[in-house]
Swiss-Prot record:
Uppermost EC category: hydrolase
Gene3D superfamilies, per the entry: P-loop containing nucleotide triphosphate hydrolases
Catalysed reaction, written as an equation: ATP + H2O = ADP + phosphate + H(+)
One CC-aspect GO term: P granule
Name used for this protein in its record: Putative helicase mov-10-B.1
Residue ranges with Polar residues bias: 91-103, 113-123
Amino acid sequence: MSRKYRKKLSRDDIRAVGFDFIEFLDDRETRSTTDRNTLKEIYNEQFRDRDGVRDPNFSSVLFALTRSSRTRVTRSEVFFDKKIRVRQNDQWSRPYRSQQNHATPHLNDAISRPSTTRVSDPSSVPEPENRVIARRRLAKTIMRQGNSEDMSVFFADKYGVRVSSELQIEDGKIHWCVEGAEVHELKLFVENTGQEAILFTCFSALHYLQYFTLDDSQRVRKDNPHRLEPNETYEVILRFKSDQIGVYPATLAFEFKENQDTRPFHIVRFIEAQHRSELTAQLGPTEPFRPKRLDTNQPMKWSIDEGFKPESSSQNFLKFVVPLDNYNCPSYTSALIEVLKGNRSSGKQLQEHQLTLESDLSFNNYMDRFDLLLYLEEDQMRMDIKRYNKKDVSMVRDRDKKLLVLELPGVSENRPSVLRGDHLLLTKSEELQNSNVTKYKGYVHRVELDQVKLGFSKRLLERFIDNMKFSVEFTINRLPLRLQHRAVHMVVQHHLKDVLFPVASRRLNPVSPSALRLFDQKLEKNPEQKTAVCNIVAGTSKPAPYLVFGPPGTGKTVTIVEAIKQVEKNTGGARILACAPSNSAADQLGEKLITSQHVDARNIYRIYASSRNPKEIPKVLENNSNVEGENIIFPCKEDLMPYKIVVCTLVTAGRLVSGGFPVGHFSHIFVDEAGHAVEPEIVISVAGLLNAETGQLVLAGDPKQLGPILRSPFAIKYGLGLSLLERLMTQNELYQKGDTGFDNRYVTKLLQNYRSHPSILKVPNELFYDNELKACADEISSRQYCTWEHLPKRGFPVIFHGVVGKDERESTSPSFFNTSEIDKIMDYLKKLLLTQAKKGIAKISPKDIGIIAPYRKQVEKIRQAIKIHRELKSLSGIEELKVGSVEEFQGQERKVIIVSTVRSSKEHIILDDKFNIGFLKNEKRFNVAVTRAKALLIMVGNPIILRTDEIWGRFMNYCIQERGYTGYDITHLEETDVIAERLLSLNIRQEITVETEESVVQQFLSPPWRHEH
């Protein structure tokens, strides 16, 4: 390689050269030298440029080392940190597995014999050589060749030389499983199977090694090559030692020459040492990952055999006055998707639709744009629900002979959502190949845990035999989609431009501070909460919505409840509709209003959808709701209208529109958790109910937390995932933060956090909330774990436990899991639950602990680990310990939160980034996960991977600075050889991919299907 300047080096690159130089000095036993001029002379004359690539100047290297706090420099002397280790440093993420096997290729195959021309190859000069330079040269030689050659050439045995081991080579890698913290040895065999002797010139790791050492009997080096005779085998021993469960890779290169006059050739081996426990072995992949394409084929013809519907458990006196159309997906939807994918050209109509999607949202395109976005989302929903379709399943008769029982694992968690009155389509397995089949429609009568009881026609029941085989087809419930379509159409009809695209308040003069006396005296001491309540009552923003920006733990729901009570008391003729996206959030509003005793309970009414299970309704709400015994009753409009406060979900608010409630009946509409809903869902509660001239819309939420879960990549791309709350705060001038803060006439940001210990709150506060949040949590509860004996630092209840694991997949599930992280999580659970109530730490219940993981498969594996753990599985209340995704924890809190980040492979981060899944590259998911904890936060993850992300790197550095880091040794993480990053490309295997119509969200996250009606 001719001498040339590198491309512009990063600070990390230059620092890596500095660490190489320190190791070079250590090799020469001159590390104790401190004279600056002497070191500069050694650097320039003995070290610099020795690998054929121009290194940075000495001053640049010193500057990079100084910035990393590893070197102290004066005018005349340089002092290197004594803690900098040499030789055995570096870990990076697990490389891809190669598809190539290491069989010896024929010499006449793709590999040509080395040139016999004598050359001055810098990697083959047979002179005494410093091992740092030797390693750097060897690595760069291989990387240089790798830019132009088939990567499989490096893995292949060649010219009669074979490099093998005691273990089998799988997918181009030696998998080495070890248990225990003692030293483990792996023998590598270098064998000459040819007819001529070969020079074995050197072997080396192509990067710094941590936890590994290499050894051989004759100390083979370039200046001490070993002549490998025909049929001779030479042993190289790789030793590994670590007390940390995890996965540790090593990349080794072996160099050979046919004689002194030929160019060297290389054989590369990847070793993956997996230090595992009994638990990690049990949780490993059940079978290799084989992606599976969804079966989307349908028979040419079919007929529907109508089933037996359940008797209505609801009595409907609320007559339909406003029609609700079907809003079926138009025929062009599939073609539009192909255009958006770039798979086909577009005609005039499709071009217009594409232009609508690519245009900014406005009142003029509001209806058309949201119609298109909802069509795109529905199309993907129809595809994703097929993930749950089943083949060759059997049913049995129920005790009620009119019903058949079908086992559906996952239905209790809404994967998928199946409600009373929904239907499934079943086809006899034996008829699937017929050109014309019968699909039996089975109506859901009851859902009991993971069983559903279905009502079919007499025709099927008469022919049914227990354990008869069927294929099962799931369908989506279109009611929420239909209501959203109608709502965006009604936006135009009811002239809601000033509400959805506000330009100013109609108040000419600002309102003076109100003299309201708040019911909740705690709010009197919180200026932001009081301001929000007063301005909502005064209507300072009308006709624009009033926003309550509520960061985690700041009491936004309490603020909304207080505002509702004050409006009811102080605004004559007020009628209030209080909504939320979920039943749980709506129930919380209702409970707080009824139990406050500041509003006559007879004026509050909670409306449930007919699909709601009466057994799940909170006792405190039963007498103030449309539940009577085991039935849901819809009162007539005349009976509902006198109530001053009506509470329901956003979807159920559409029932009020259908029932003919007059526009303007509700003077105020409140939406809590407004950031969780797509804009058309919010609009269900507004269009047809709110008078734009006189009404007040109030939205409460946090645009810095997760928004609604969507499945269609195009619906996400073109903005359906942007809630109305976030759209106003990011795109409307009225809600922008100025030099003096937000304009309180339109928005109030709550600042006092009543949940978390200050150390837990610090990083998200700085990253997302302009460092304005104030830690106001109760000191006794928030400091409960400050003296816990397992904290790395007393008084700092945040732990970052570094684990270098492996993100794996199994069977046909594309979702990831990491058993090394699970092992460490079980260790922390034992410490929390089995050795508690000691040393001043109060006893904790499993229900006060939450475990968060980004991928569905990790959630499942953690649950499995708890069930098989000898000590944890029988613990009282262990079933109440919640394990779930970030989305499932949003809006919740726990005393202790444990987070598993899963990611340990750099190649998969690209996937996370592209599709906005996982923790990395999704700052909202990070924010929600961190801010759930009240007293103790434990993060378990790969520090090498996480430090590459700006947000995670910030959090990790914070933990290191506060001495809250433990686990994998990162003392020398900055000494990582830059070449190691590039070596990953040598071992990249293109994983088997199958084109599937299933969304990435469904594949990796498998979120529960919403059933909030």
